[in-house]
């Protein structure tokens, strides 16, 4: 690891003189621990609004991945607002700084799947109150679309996540006739965000071929090394 000067990092942010004196006094060019501490001190802390129509303890890959993402962001000092539908069961593994709950509607014939109702005024007021640095939309359903419009109205950058090939498996949910409109909508949705996160290089390539032209960034799925290790 290359050495990062203490002076350079301290200039990035206003610290009390006592902090600066301590770090200068204990400066050690071979101290990886010191570099780590300094990086943590100067890392920007963001206010992030996360919008999703699925959330733990629902059992699916998107809900589980999102839970781990929120835990990781909060551990790094970021402040999280969660906008999601009301659920029958409560998640006990994570507590957001703020939550905005909207009414939920089950998908016909699939009671375990639901989407959030487009309560624009409620969502807009929640975003305005939290004043996030960015709004990250995980799902592209009615709630996600509502959040997109609300964030744009407040001139807040919007990022999105592409987690499920809904336009593919919709063929198996009696929605075959809607595949083309769904494809067009998903392409339009993600092209109206400043960034779309994807789980793999394969998905990134597929979205580019699909016509998504906004910047795409691979955010791989991690492994809990406490539970899973050699």
For the regions a language model picked out, list residue spans one by one.
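An amphipathic, basic-hydrophobic alpha-helix
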Residues: 108-137, 142-149, 153, 180, ...
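Alpha-helix capping/helix-boundary segments
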Residues: 88, 142-143, 202-204
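Structural motif
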Residues: 83, 137-138, 161
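Donor nucleotide-sugar binding/catalytic pocket of nucleotide-sugar-dependent glycosyltransferases
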Residues: 84, 100-103, 183-230
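Active-site proximal beta-strand in glycosyltransferases
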Residues: 48, 134, 149-169, 197, ...
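Nucleotide-sugar donor phosphate/pyrophosphate-binding loop at the beta->alpha transition
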Residues: 157-159, 167-188, 225
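N-terminal subdomain of nucleotide-sugar transferases
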Residues: 2-101
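Short, hinge-like loop/turn segments at secondary-structure boundaries
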Residues: 97-103, 153-155, 175-179, 214-216
């Amino acid at each position: 690891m290359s050495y990062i000067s203490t002076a350079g990092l301290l200039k990035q942010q206003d610290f009390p003189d006592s902090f600066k004196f301590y770090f200068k006094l204990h400066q050690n060019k071979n101290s990886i621990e010191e570099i780590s501490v300094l990086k943590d001190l100067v890392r920007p802390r963001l206010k992030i609004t996360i919008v999703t129509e699925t959330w733990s303890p629902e059992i699916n890959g998107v809900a589980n991945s999102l839970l781990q993402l929120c835990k990781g962001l909060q551990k790094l000092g970021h402040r999280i607002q969660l906008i999601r539908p009301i659920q029958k069961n409560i998640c006990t593994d994570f507590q957001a700084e703020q939550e905005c709950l909207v009414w939920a509607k089950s998908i016909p014939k699939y009671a375990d799947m639901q989407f959030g109702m487009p309560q624009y005024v409620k969502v807009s007021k929640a975003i305005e109150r939290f004043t996030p640095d960015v709004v990250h939309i995980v799902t592209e359903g009615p709630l996600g679309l509502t959040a997109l419009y609300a964030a744009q109205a407040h001139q807040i950058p919007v990022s999105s996540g592409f987690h499920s090939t809904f336009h593919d498996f919709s063929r198996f949910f009696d929605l075959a006739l809607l595949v083309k409109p769904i494809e067009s909508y998903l392409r339009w949705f993600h092209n109206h965000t400043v960034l779309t996160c994807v789980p793999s290089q394969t998905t990134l390539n597929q979205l580019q071929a699909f016509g998504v032209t906004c910047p795409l960034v691979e955010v791989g799925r991690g492994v809990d090394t406490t539970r899973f290790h050699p």
